[in-house]
Amino acid sequence: MAFVKAIKNKAYFKRFQVKYRRRREGKTDYAARRRLILQDKNKYNAPKYRFVVRVTNSRVLCQVMYATLQGDRLVCSADSQELTRYGIKVGLTNYSAAYATGLLLARRLLKQKGLADEFKGLEKPSGEEYHIEEVSEERRPFKCVLDVGIVATTVGNRVFGAMKGACDGGLHIPHSNKRFPGFTKGEDGADDSYNPEVHRARIYGLHVAEYMRTLKEEDPERYQAQFSAYIRNKIDPDSIEKMYEEAFQKIRANPDPVKKEAREVKRVRQGAMIKTAKSQYVRNVKLDKETRKERVLKKIQMVADKMAEEE
């Protein structure tokens, strides 16, 4: 079939239909979202939970959500910035932090639902493939499906680290090991292989420790600049594994979020100026009809007096 170039005339623009705003902005893949939220028709009013992972420049966000006609509803969430409470004060966006955030969300959600004692998950991460539904026989675990957004699902991506943390924490998320670090695809008909030790090294931050040692030997100045936060917090390559190991135990001991105290909002009016704790802005007092009428009469009188003086 010959290539036919689209003629962008008046009829083309008249019939043109724009895509959804979030599709135009490159934020949502609606084809993938439709498949994610579509529930079986024989499950009446049963929400389909999604394990949502989003990675920014400064944090890893994990949320469990479900879709409604009015919009998505949040069930539980965890943020890698919370890991500072558990002893992880640096590297809040790496693979290990993503795993810890997923673990924190899983333990928090199960405690919220009253399932924490029944579904404890894998207490000592080993990198081995683990499915909670194969362990529990009496009761079905809390099930979610992974929502990665628009990221490239490459081997070793941090979203799969967060998913691994949630699975080890006791959530049931259907998956395989094909996107975990340590997976190697077989060539020329050979079988695929998976090395859990490589994955375990990523979970405990051993790849960071190895890079720290290498950089310290080869370029000490760059090491001082790149790992300044580690040096400031007195974290050396030999203490990284212990830091994460203790953090995982603390997360299991107390996954509850810290409740923030509601601050008093102080607003003071000084004439037409509103002053708050952070800023100030102008908001004129609304006048009633009688006051406005008096102001108009005064202005008329002022103009009349001025004209009389000039004469």
Swiss-Prot record:
Keywords: Cytoplasm, Nucleus, Ribonucleoprotein, Ribosomal protein, RNA-binding, rRNA-binding. One of its GO terms (cellular component) is nucleus. InterPro entries: Rbsml_uL18_euk, Ribosomal_uL18_C_euk. It is found in: Cytoplasm; Nucleus. GO terms for molecular function: 5S rRNA binding; structural constituent of ribosome. Transmembrane segments: none annotated. One of its GO terms (biological process) is ribosomal large subunit assembly. SUPFAM superfamilies: Translational machinery components. Its main location: cytoplasm. Component of the ribosome, a large ribonucleoprotein complex responsible for the synthesis of proteins in the cell. The small ribosomal subunit (SSU) binds messenger RNAs (mRNAs) and translates the encoded message by selecting cognate aminoacyl-transfer RNA (tRNA) molecules. The large subunit (LSU) contains the ribosomal catalytic site termed the peptidyl transferase center (PTC), which catalyzes the formation of peptide bonds, thereby polymerizing the amino acids delivered by tRNAs into a polypeptide chain. Component of the large ribosomal subunit (LSU). PANTHER family: LARGE RIBOSOMAL SUBUNIT PROTEIN UL18, RIBOSOMAL PROTEIN L5-RELATED. Belongs to the universal ribosomal protein uL18 family. This is Large ribosomal subunit protein uL18. It comes from Eimeria tenella (Coccidian parasite). The lineage of its organism: Eukaryota, Sar, Alveolata, Apicomplexa, Conoidasida.
